[in-house]
From Swiss-Prot:
It catalyses: a 3'-end 3'-phospho-ribonucleotide-RNA + a 5'-end dephospho-ribonucleoside-RNA + GTP = a ribonucleotidyl-ribonucleotide-RNA + GMP + diphosphate; a 3'-end 2',3'-cyclophospho-ribonucleotide-RNA + a 5'-end dephospho-ribonucleoside-RNA + GTP + H2O = a ribonucleotidyl-ribonucleotide-RNA + GMP + diphosphate + H(+). Ligation probably proceeds through 3 nucleotidyl transfer steps, with 2',3'-cyclic phosphate termini being hydrolyzed to 3'-P termini in a step that precedes 3'-P activation with GMP. In the first nucleotidyl transfer step, RTCB reacts with GTP to form a covalent RTCB-histidine-GMP intermediate with release of PPi; in the second step, the GMP moiety is transferred to the RNA 3'-P; in the third step, the 5'-OH from the opposite RNA strand attacks the activated 3'-P to form a 3',5'-phosphodiester bond and release GMP. The lineage of its organism: Eukaryota, Metazoa, Chordata, Craniata, Vertebrata. It is an enzyme of class 6 (ligase). One of its GO terms (biological process) is tRNA splicing, via endonucleolytic cleavage and ligation. Catalytic subunit of the tRNA-splicing ligase complex that acts by directly joining spliced tRNA halves to mature-sized tRNAs by incorporating the precursor-derived splice junction phosphate into the mature tRNA as a canonical 3',5'-phosphodiester. May act as an RNA ligase with broad substrate specificity, and may function toward other RNAs. InterPro entries: RtcB, RtcB-like_sf, RtcB_euk. This is RNA-splicing ligase RtcB homolog. HAMAP family: RtcB_euk. Mn(2+) 1 binds at residues 119, 122, 227. It comes from the Eukaryota. Mn(2+) 2 binds at residues 122, 259, 353.
Length: 505
């Protein structure tokens, strides 16, 4: 029996101006409470979605994000609370922008591929340059074209980096270390990657041959959907000290942002795991509120196989972003007729938005080992954390937040408050407000392209028809999302970037 909207509201209360609590009972079997972070406009979107669902309207076939946060709170072994970040929107199993941690000491605790997502280690890398906007504006069309020519983009795009089956096995195991050995990365690139660009538990034998077949031709490709490479300029600096540590010292400085993931390989790893886990759930008598939350005990063979395969797909994504960094450096080199080194094309940082990792956190005053699922959310560790690079020990970890086509992106830093409230996690981007299908119905791709041209943004798109799905109108306002995290204290604004050229799948 479904409840009325007013009945649903009985389970929700506001903790402070940017945070709501979802009390136990909102959905069956909740082990812990849920919370979600919003400001006024984002709050309105969340409650509208719930209201529509209680009238029988579905969001693109998914449950409303609030319900999904509640269903995650009912998973075995979850600890502290199920957390929705300001960019949260309905997804497969977990909402995108929903993170949760599971107690590794609890034999019942599970791992759920729906808590990582199909694009394993979809993430963002930011490069800086010593160029100024005035250097790039006159040649931005050539630069956009050079990047479009160098980086293979689009749905079925194939890579230009030579790769045999043996190379793929090594890349899956070694991550950025493979790129380094093959000459596609600089030694310091690795220092500025989450996990140093290599998850050590990766086991290529846990990646099916079907997944490898999908991944082999796609390495060093951008893919379609919300993936992009953008030439950006620094629009505002909120934290000069943190910005300086990142090599950003003035407005107008040019950067490059690369947003991509593990392509078809990661998708197949997730699909394979979901099939195996359905069987494991029957065997181990695990019940969940939503079939999409298929999971397995962390300690089970299925749980371990998935974590090892997921880590390999994660490594593939880091190699992918490294390959695209190599191609970007070549494109800049060609246009500006000088070496990437002379252009200071260094990696500021590289973060993952879809991953599960074993981490140490303090919960109720006790140090615990947890499996932290971050889906559509970003690790944001505070200053002095042992897992962040030496360069950022005093500022906190850089967090890269991609906007949507034609809107701003942000660099944030991690905080101590985020460490206690959200397991050192913050938002990842704008978060969809319209489903892809709805975007295609409501928006015309030519209008979207014209609007970008009006903003003075050079654009190269492999599949124009996909542009509507990624139009700024399809998304929540990234500034709302970032400000909510800043005001709530779970991350701190450092730099704002605006695009001048976009390359898209």
């Amino acid at each position: 029996m479904s409840r009325s909207y007013n009945d649903e509201l009985q389970y929700l209360d506001k903790i402070h101006k940017n945070c709501w609590r979802i009390r136990k009972g909102f959905v069956p079997n909740m082990q812990v409470e849920g919370v979600f972070y919003v400001n006024d406009p984002l709050e309105k979107l969340m409650f509208e979605e719930l209201r529509n669902a209680s009238r029988g309207g579905a969001a693109g076939g998914f449950l409303p994000a609030m319900k999904q946060i509640g269903n995650v709170a009912a998973l075995p072994g979850i600890i502290h609370r199920s957390i929705g970040l300001p960019d949260v929107h309905s997804g497969y199993g977990f909402a995108i922008g929903n993170m949760a941690a599971f107690d590794m000491d609890n034999p019942e605790a599970v791992v759920s591929p729906g808590g990582v997502g199909f694009d394993i280690n979809c993430g963002v890398r930011l490069l800086r340059t010593n160029l100024d906007e005035s250097d790039v504006q006159p040649v931005k069309e050539q630069l956009a074209q050079a990047m479009f020519d160098h980086i293979p983009v689009g749905v079925g795009s194939k890579g230009v980096i030579p790769m045999g089956a043996k190379d793929l096995e090594e890349a899956l195991e070694m991550g950025v270390d493979w790129s380094l050995r093959e000459g596609y990365a600089w030694a310091e690139d690795k220092e500025h990657c989450e996990e140093y660009g290599r998850m050590l538990q990766a086991d290529p034998s846990k990646v099916s041959s079907k997944a490898k077949k999908r991944g082999l031709p796609q390495l060093g490709t951008l893919g379609a959907g919300n993936h992009y490479a953008e030439v950006q300029v620094v629009d505002d600096i909120y934290d000069e000290y943190a910005a300086k540590k990142m090599g950003i010292d003035h407005k107008g400085q040019v950067c490059v942002m690369i947003h991509s993931g593990s392509r078809g390989l990661g998708h197949q790893v997730a699909t394979d795991a979901l099939v195996a886990m359905e069987k494991a759930m029957k065997r181990d008598k695990i019940t969940v509120n939503d079939r999409q939350l298929a999971c397995a005990r962390i300690s089970s063979a299925e749980g371990q196989d998935y974590l090892k395969g997921m880590a390999a797909a994660g490594n593939y994504a880091w190699v992918n972003r490294s390959s695209m960094t190599f191609l970007t450096r070549q494109a800049f080199s060609k246009v500006f007729n000088t070496t990437p080194d002379d252009l200071d094309l260094h990696v500021i940082y590289d973060v993952s938005h879809n991953i599960a990792k074993v981490e140490q956190h303090v919960v109720d005053g006790k140090e615990k080992t947890l499996l932290v699922h971050r889906k559509g959310s970003t690790r944001a560790f505070p200053p002095h954390h042992p897992l962040i690079p030496v360069d950022y020990q005093l500022t906190g970890q850089p967090v890269l937040i991609g906007g949507t086509m034609g809107t701003c992106s942000y660099v944030l830093t991690g905080t101590d408050q985020g460490m206690t409230e959200t397991f050192g996690t913050t938002c990842h981007g704008a978060g969809r407000a319209l489903s892809r299908a709805k975007s295609r119905r409501n928006l015309d791709f030519q209008d979207v392209l014209d609007k970008l041209a009006d903003l003075g943004i050079a654009i190269r798109v492999a599949s124009p028809k996909l542009v509507m799905e990624e139009a700024p109108e399809s998304y929540k306002n990234v500034t709302d999302v970032v400000n909510t995290c800043h005001d709530a204290g779970i991350s701190k604004k450092a730099i704002k970037l605006r695009p001048i050229a976009v390359i898209k799948g």
